[in-house]
Amino acid sequence: MNRLPSSASALACSAHALNLIEKRTLNHEEMKALNREVIDYFKEHVNPGFLEYRKSVTAGGDYGAVEWQAGSLNTLVDTQGQEFIDCLGGFGIFNVGHRNPVVVSAVQNQLAKQPLHSQELLDPLRAMLAKTLAALTPGKLKYSFFCNSGTESVEAALKLAKAYQSPRGKFTFIATSGAFHGKSLGALSATAKSIFRRPFMPLLPGFRHVPFGNIDAMSMAFSEGKKTGDEIAAVILEPIQGEGGVILPPQGYLTEVRKLCDEFGALMILDEVQTGMGRTGKMFACEHENVQPDILCLAKALGGGVMPIGATIATEEVFSVLFDNPFLHTTTFGGNPLACAAALATINVLLEQNLPAQAEQKGDTLLDGFRQLAREYPNLVHDARGKGMLMAIEFVDNETGYRFASEMFRQRVLVAGTLNNAKTIRIEPPLTLTIELCEQVLKSARNALAAMQVSVEEV
């Protein structure tokens, strides 16, 4: 039997939600009621699969952790008042911390004037952000297209590369095994995880995947394309594979890929959605090798953890294919004033506080500690790796990684696995994480592993 729409029910639900938004604190009964509501609504109206996935971030496997508010720049508080050190960072969103006052203030000030653009008049903040990114990014990157997410920035990059290379008779893209570029149809064609790809096959034609970090395989793909007349339009890759398990390529890999692109007339697209904005110890990870892409994809931390925004930045030569018809690829909300205000404030904070350098220093402290723990618990931990504040602890199997996330939750530290590598736990805290909190995270990790070791010995 079809359910009839109910305006009264919708009005009551929205009014209840608005009442919650206005509240700063909840009493015990309100907390319990909200937990029950959220769990029920996820089950009935969002996706029940998320509940099973999030069992690792509950104390008793009862989905009890419902997010309520930021505690500080580096912590989250749930509805029960429990404060967690954030070592997940919203998968790389909170580089400048939670509710950074500079970013929040910029958005609030813009909100008081004009939240969204008219679509017809020229919007000043979009122009100013584009100019700022042209100054900030490496090489000849000059023009920016703004959108709302990482996968949208990748879609724009792929379309831009197609528009530039199709008249030159080049149609094929090279991506890499283990890659994650998003889940919209074009981005998914470059992504390399079968569990995400298979239900939507066939995907876009013209994508080849070669092993990440293997320059010989990359070179062979270029050569074969040349021999068969199926020439390469562009290479798309992450400087460090985030969802693949924080996989670092050999030193010099990006430099060699750049040389191949130049030799064969292909574009180099770097997806820095997760590695960008200071995360790895440089503003952009490609700067570790002084590599300059033709197209750069940004999102996640660009909005300062306050607003969603993505950007696709390209050289004038490439971007000029859109000059004659700027409406070839557009988006209603991309580059809106609130998002641009957040991005401009985020860049200001990153530079003023020199957060990329802090990420390098504090990342070294954390990684040294994790590697020491790996040496102490070789039966549990296979590897600890990373760059800056993008790190991973790889466990011996999926179940051990899941157990570590649960134990860290009990220690009030929030971590999670990666989408393409289940036995790898990602450590991706705000770049503002203090040295004291770094030490607390390492202490919690030691306690978690010690508890896991006891369980192993008791079996």
From Swiss-Prot:
Alphabetical keyword list: Aminotransferase, Pyridoxal phosphate, Transferase
Pathway(s) annotated for this protein in UniProt: Amine and polyamine degradation; putrescine degradation; 4-aminobutanal from putrescine (transaminase route): step 1/1
InterPro entries: Aminotrans_3, Aminotrans_3_PPA_site, Class-III_PLP-dep_AT, Putrescine_aminotransferase, PyrdxlP-dep_Trfase, PyrdxlP-dep_Trfase_major, PyrdxlP-dep_Trfase_small
One GO-annotated biological process of the protein: L-lysine catabolic process
Cofactor: pyridoxal 5'-phosphate
Molecular function per GO: diamine transaminase activity; identical protein binding; putrescine--2-oxoglutarate transaminase activity; pyridoxal phosphate binding
Residues binding pyridoxal 5'-phosphate, per UniProt: 150-151, 274, 332
Catalytic activity field: an alkane-alpha,omega-diamine + 2-oxoglutarate = an omega-aminoaldehyde + L-glutamate; putrescine + 2-oxoglutarate = 1-pyrroline + L-glutamate + H2O; cadaverine + 2-oxoglutarate = 5-aminopentanal + L-glutamate
SUPFAM superfamilies referenced in this protein's UniProt entry, alphabetically: PLP-dependent transferases (SSF53383)
Chain positions with N6-(pyridoxal phosphate)lysine modification: 300
EC number(s) from the headed UniProt entry: 2.6.1.82, 2.6.1.29
Family statement drawn from the similarity comment of this UniProt entry: Belongs to the class-III pyridoxal-phosphate-dependent aminotransferase family. Putrescine aminotransferase subfamily.
Role played: Catalyzes the aminotransferase reaction from putrescine to 2-oxoglutarate, leading to glutamate and 4-aminobutanal, which spontaneously cyclizes to form 1-pyrroline. This is the first step in one of two pathways for putrescine degradation, where putrescine is converted into 4-aminobutanoate (gamma-aminobutyrate or GABA) via 4-aminobutanal. Also functions as a cadaverine transaminase in a a L-lysine degradation pathway to succinate that proceeds via cadaverine, glutarate and L-2-hydroxyglutarate.
UniProt cross-references to HAMAP family, sorted A to Z: Putres_aminotrans_3
Annotated protein name in UniProt: Putrescine aminotransferase
Organism: Salmonella paratyphi C (strain RKS4594)
Gene designation: patA
